[in-house]
Curated annotation (Swiss-Prot):
This is RING finger protein 44. GO terms for biological process: protein ubiquitination. The keyword Transmembrane helix does not apply. Transmembrane segments: none annotated. It holds the Pfam family zf-RING_2. PROSITE patterns: ZF_RING_2. Keywords: Metal-binding, Zinc, Zinc-finger. A zinc finger (RING-type) spans 380-421. Signal peptide: none annotated. The keyword Metal-binding applies. Residues 1-86 are annotated as: Disordered.
Amino acid sequence: MRPWALAVTRWPPSAPVGQRRFSAGPGSTPGQLWGSPGLEGPLASPPARDERLPSQQPPSRPPHLPVEERRASAPAGGSPRMLHPATQQSPFMVDLHEQVHQGPVPLSYTVTTVTTQGFPLPTGQHIPGCSAQQLPACSVMFSGQHYPLCCLPPPLIQACTMQQLPVPYQAYPHLISSDHYILHPPPPAPPPQPTHMAPLGQFVSLQTQHPRMPLQRLDNDVDLRGDQPSLGSFTYSTSAPGPALSPSVPLHYLPHDPLHQELSFGVPYSHMMPRRLSTQRYRLQQPLPPPPPPPPPPPYYPSFLPYFLSMLPMSPTAMGPTISLDLDVDDVEMENYEALLNLAERLGDAKPRGLTKADIEQLPSYRFNPDSHQSEQTLCVVCFSDFEARQLLRVLPCNHEFHTKCVDKWLKANRTCPICRADASEVPREAE
């Protein structure tokens, strides 16, 4: 096992060691990327100043041991070791996930350092940052393809852009942090790379091979654990100043809202990575338009009642004293007189409704005798009862006979005979 090899994380405890992919130096072949206990790489023998490193590998532990037990069994002491690209140009590669091409697997990992020879990285040790002329000794591998981390945005790797990296046992910040600035360095020149590594432009968004897809605050933690015990985890800290970046590389810090931070870098599987879309909606803050003015009142129309009444043939006195019409009184009287004449012609002469008591008594009457009765009428039409002996009957000028009480009452209200409708008052005068 090489001392700088790292293993894929999020493997279940029962996963065999052969399924975990490791990364090696630039001189290793693709077949040597699979970790085996018997292989030794160029990084197996570090520089001469690390003399206290053990020469053989510690005994391998069963793969089913949890990470907490491995951390508990890790040694507490060790000699400090400096990591700098000038002294060690071996690449530092991480296989984030091997199954990313099979589906949208969320990248939720925690970055930890892994050592295979048992020497720790003490807390006080500083890891100097790299400049733009020197590529960092680290890269990320997605499904067998290597991604140089120094070309990615600064929040992805803190060892290349930040000031220092002390190694306390704390949690590593998010892979894509919520810093208030987005670092935009100028595009560096493509450095020479080994044959087994893919070209730099294939993964960096310097070319237009892959579409730029924004990732909005992916809360991802990369956890890199190997078979060997881990002694600490990288932690971003700005408590002490570190080596400054090269003055030839100007850095432009652009202010940006942390809630809407977008980092764009081309990755072949960027469309498979989970992204948290911003659901904040902006509402247009504009004052509401003033309400429309009320409609104007309808125009005043004078009443048509006086005009309508003036068209009627009526006298102004009948309308009442409140209505005064400018009409000639003589003309009105003449019209009324003519109207009355027309009415009299249609009605005829005015006659009283009934006969007076004197007129009624002038009509002849007699006592009914059945033996001497000569008329064919035997009953009274008013009361519809038969004549009886010794009853008083009244005879009208039309020779119709009735009971005296019945016909007198009828003649007081009517002037005609109840049977033939003849005038009861004319006949006697003509007879006289």
